[in-house]
Curated annotation (Swiss-Prot):
Disruption phenotype: Forms aconidial fluffy colonies. The lineage of its organism: Eukaryota, Fungi, Dikarya, Ascomycota, Pezizomycotina. One of its GO terms (cellular component) is nucleus. Residues 285-294, 365-374 have a biased composition (Basic residues). This is C2H2 type master regulator of conidiophore development brlA.
Amino acid sequence: MRSQGNMSDRLTIEVDCTSLGSNECPSMASSFSPMESPTPTPTSVYSQGSLASPTWHEGGSYPGQGYERHTGTTPMRSAFRLASMTSNDSMGMSYGQMEAQERMPMTDFLSGYDENVEHFWIPQEAQKAYEHGVPGLPYPQAMPQYSTMGRSSYRQHAAPYLPDSATNPCLSRSIFHQPERVPNSMSMGNVIPWMAPQPDSIAPQTIAPSQVAPVTPPPSYSEFSGSINTFKTHSPTTPVRSCSLGTTSGTDTPMSRLSGGMDYLDDFNQSPVYRDNLARVQRQPSRKVARKQSSKQSLSLENLPSIIKQVQFKCKEPGCKGRFKRQEHLKRHMKSHSKEKPHVCWVPGCERAFSRSDNLNAHYTKTHSKRGGRNRYVATLDENSPDYNPEYRGQLTADGRPVYNSKSQDLMPDARETSEEAWLE
């Protein structure tokens, strides 16, 4: 079985397994030609752990070679070697045609393998990743997902959750085959995949009146005031309706109404409660217009309170239309009509007289407390001046400053009192 070849064409690979015993995981050395495909062989990939090749099984026939097992003297190392072959050699004997004594047990070179074959169960119809007559073994493909992998241990799990549309006959049919019920914004590209029509799996269903619940209006419809009895209850008009995927009959379902059906919208607009509230909203003017209307009404005399019309105190002077709420206000007003002006300005050269004291104080502030006017400036009446003293009555300098310790200062208060007494008499 072993052929003669040049040693330079062979490459020896030794794998040490220090975690196992001397006879459990022997190091292996395989010889192959570097001129062949550099992809690793299943022997070097799947014999170092508890993995099984996804494309091998005992019944298959692939180019194989007999194992030569040798027991070494070292306690932690043993070796088995594939029969040497060159690039021109072909593996003639398959693993399934070997005798029982020539086969190496699986437990000797797979550390995680045991006698339970459930861990390495491989379907017989699995596609092989090699071809007959091609020297060398290509790199095995990844483990595919087989539909036959569901064994008895996996069948004990509970059935997966199914949506209501898969069990309810009323929701199991597709609503997208009804062009008059579908709004323009929806298209078949936006349909959820599990809601797509499947003619092979869904059969035509028949809906009885007992299976269809009365459709209630949307939540926003209940905000309108009114009796609940005015709402229209939608019920099927025919006793039995036959629904199928291929027909486009006028079926009435909750999904069709919620998806924007025009029939339900028409019924909603024809409700008396909706019409009354819509008319009430249309009759209400805007806030800006209502504010203008209220301001116009408030300007008219008819809308004024009655207490304003009842004026108690009127001026008796001919031609005067003065009206006052309080008597003291009328008395002060009457002094303006009389010739009595007891309040006289004390500033030399001014001598202006006023019937009211507040008018005199305003005269001091506006006339004599400012510089540069035509009237005389008085520093004692200027709040910003260091000589500010509104109680001062006396002589003034040319620039309006007070002159203290003068006889006129002592006589001025007496003269003022005399003049006031004369005016009062």
